[in-house]
Curated annotation (Swiss-Prot):
The chain crosses the membrane at residues 38-58, 94-114, 118-138, 193-213, 215-235. Pfam families: ATP-synt_A. One of its GO terms (cellular component) is plasma membrane. F-type ATPases have 2 components, CF(1) - the catalytic core - and CF(0) - the membrane proton channel. CF(1) has five subunits: alpha(3), beta(3), gamma(1), delta(1), epsilon(1). CF(0) has three main subunits: a(1), b(2) and c(9-12). The alpha and beta chains form an alternating ring which encloses part of the gamma chain. CF(1) is attached to CF(0) by a central stalk formed by the gamma and epsilon chains, while a peripheral stalk is formed by the delta and b chains. This is ATP synthase subunit a. One of its GO terms (biological process) is proton motive force-driven plasma membrane ATP synthesis. The gene is atpB. GO terms for molecular function: proton-transporting ATP synthase activity, rotational mechanism. It comes from the Bacteria.
């Protein structure tokens, strides 16, 4: 059976969208569509696992730690050392948030690797919402610590040459940068997770369309890429969390930086 490239692409995307719309509970309130679909189910599952992992870890501390407590303590140490105080020790107070964000995204990424699940972080609406939350926290912390006027003035160096001309230009470029940060956060996580799952799906779909002989090539490639996706799941969660911490601290210490 011969299948054109266009037909294969259409079938893959159709199957991907069908998976997203599975398990739907249709719900509409005041004309607003609040239907619960597959991404929402797995988002709730990821949030529940993250909460239980951290709650149980905090409630079961012992003088003689078991394996679970050791894991929790090592994660806490990892978050304190890797996320806390990227620019200044005062910024360390935000590492619990960054660590929680890392664990949450890692859980969602790993869940998405299981058969018949859904990779929530491959949904641009979810990653954009998280990135928007980071943007709001960043601006809030910058204004709270420095004051609105001082924070906005810090967006361009005070000692620029030809200041009347260069200061507005540099300030405007920094304004664009502030909006670019959440955009790149959202797109980086979304694109990396979506691309990885689509590649695995394509490799396995080749068996259905071109017959069993292609399995000898498709399956090994899919397995190797699946293992690589585990690494991607970890690194993308880490990148999102560490950049969130850095952006918040850059806003906190904006005046000192200039």
């Amino acid at each position: 059976m011969e299948v054109t490239q266009e037909e294969l692409r259409h079938e893959i995307l159709h199957t991907w969208e069908a998976a997203r719309e599975a398990w739907v509970i249709h719900l509409e309130i005041a004309g607003i569509n609040l239907s619960i679909n597959k991404p929402v189910w797995f988002l709730w599952l990821g949030a529940a696992i993250t909460f239980l992992f951290m709650y149980v870890g905090a409630r079961t501390l012992r003088d003689r730690p078991g394996a679970y407590q050791v894991l929790v303590e090592e994660l806490f140490r990892f978050g304190r050392d890797m996320f806390g105080g990227q620019i200044n020790e005062e910024g360390r107070k935000w590492f619990p948030y960054s660590l929680t964000l890392f664990i949450f995204l890692l859980v969602l990424n790993i869940i998405g690797l299981f058969p018949n699940s859904y990779p929530v972080t491959s949904n641009i609406s979810f990653t954009a919402t998280l990135a928007l939350f980071t943007f709001v926290l960043t601006q809030y912390e910058g204004v709270r610590r420095n004051g609105l006027v001082t924070y906005l003035k810090s967006w361009a160096p005070a000692d620029l040459p030809a200041k009347p001309l260069m200061y507005p230009i540099m300030w405007f470029l920094h304004l664009i940068q502030e909006f670019t940060k959440p955009l790149t956060l959202a797109l980086r996580l979304y694109a990396n997770i979506l691309a990885g799952h689509l590649i695995i799906f394509v490799f396995l779909s080749l068996i259905l369309y071109f017959g069993l002989p292609t399995a000898f090539v498709s399956v090994p490639f899919a397995v190797v890429f699946y293992a690589f996706e585990i690494f991607v799941a970890v690194i993308q969660a880490y990148i999102f969390a560490i950049l969130t911490q850095v952006y918040i601290e850059l806003a906190m210490f904006a005046e000192e930086a200039h």
